[in-house]
A protein has these predicted regions:
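ATP-dependent adenylation/nucleotidyltransferase module used to activate substrates
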Residues: 1-150, 161, 170-171, 251
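AMP-forming adenylation/ATP pyrophosphatase catalytic core
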Residues: 118-346
Length: 346
């Protein structure tokens, strides 16, 4: 019999939270054959595994536990620590998504016979006029997570469903309440998921690593006294420096030798950054030209000029672009590429 109503089977990445749980419910309502998968990235994720099991029982979907601890250590935890110890400010989600999370989901989908994968990210996936799949902004600007997904290529995007891209967060919570899900009012996760207390310096130290510690250097080049180690600071930081300078200052530069260079408040705006590890959704070079660019997930996208190679010039200047973070490029609503900030210039 020719079943015109057939919907593909889909493997949903679950965490036990409201977003991934409602993703399961929405896809099942649309007729998809849904399975769940929860990824064990590190010991800190054991609670999420149990919460995902609870959600899967409530939703009556089979759940597979994926052990990605070795990949997470190699592709996220170790590079994260090394980057901080080198004076950079990494974003672990941008390391994890293309290298661990979505790769694990895709491999599991193949093993389980699922044609599609899905997550609870607030974004959309659309195919452009040339047949290229792209991550696009969601309906909810306040929840936009496209920045976090810029590293995904066609292998993932062509099979990825993101149903929450069409909804606002309050709508998702209301759906969870209507379904009487235990996670309906669970708080949003804001911290680094594998460092629940947010103290990345303590996490690095617990792994037996010691970031260089040098001097605070004043804007006019004078040594002001020892710092705690460069893993305690990030570019743009103003609070927690432990200095009394008589006027507001911020971290302008972090040097691998352990020194932390300061700037006066008002001087933290930069016009140029140099990027490397540049990627695009289709693997093709991004042409020189004008784009809207974000340097942080929650930042506003600003007009920028790309030289087609490595140099990005902002108009207007942006506050405290941090080496180790990513610059993500947009044309309209679509993500068209992104790279890692290596160097900045006022």
């Amino acid at each position: 019999m020719n079943d015109l109503s057939h919907k593909p089977s889909v493997l949903v990445g679950m965490s036990g939270g409201v977003d991934s749980s409602v993703t399961v419910a929405l896809l099942r309502e649309k007729g998809y054959q849904v399975q769940g998968a929860v990824i064990l990235f590190s010991p800190a994720h054991e609670k999420a595994v149990e919460e995902a099991k609870t959600a899967a029982r409530q939703l009556d979907v089979p759940l597979t536990v994926l052990d990605a601890r070795a990949d997470f250590e190699a592709h996220v935890a170790a590079p994260f620590c090394a980057s901080y110890c080198a004076g950079r400010t990494p974003n672990p989600c941008l390391l994890c998504n293309p290298n661990v999370k979505f790769r694990s989901l895709l491999q599991a989908a193949d093993r389980l016979g699922c044609e599609k994968i899905a997550t609870g990210h607030y974004a959309r996936v659309e195919q452009d006029e040339k047949g290229v799949w792209r991550v696009c902004r969601p309906k909810s600007d306040a929840r936009d997570q496209t920045y976090m997904l810029y590293g995904l290529g066609q292998e993932v995007l062509s099979r990825l469903l993101l149903p929450l891209g069409e909804y606002q967060k309050p709508e998702i919570r209301e759906m969870a309440r209507q379904a009487q899900l235990e996670c309906a009012d669970s708080p949003d996760s804001m911290e680094i998921c594998f460092i629940p207390d947010g103290d990345h310096a303590a996490y690095i130290a617990a792994r037996g690593l010691h970031a260089p510690a040098g001097q605070f250097i004043s804007p006019d080049g004078k040594a002001l006294g020892p710092n705690l180690g460069i893993d305690h600071y990030t570019v743009g930081q103003r609070k927690g420096l432990g200095l009394a300078l008589g006027r507001p200052a911020f971290v302008r530069e972090i040097r691998p030798n352990g020194d932390v260079l300061l700037g006066w408040s008002g001087e933290e705006f930069f016009r140029k950054v140099w990027l490397d590890r540049f990627v695009t959704p289709d693997g093709q070079p991004l042409a020189a030209g004008e784009y809207l660019v974000k340097i942080r997930s929650a930042a506003k996208a600003v007009p920028s000029e790309w030289n087609g190679s490595d140099l990005l010039t902002f108009t207007p200047a942006v506050r405290a672009p941090a080496p180790g973070q990513s610059a993500v490029f947009y044309k309209g609503d679509a993500v068209v590429g992104g790279g890692v900030i290596q160097q900045t210039e006022r």
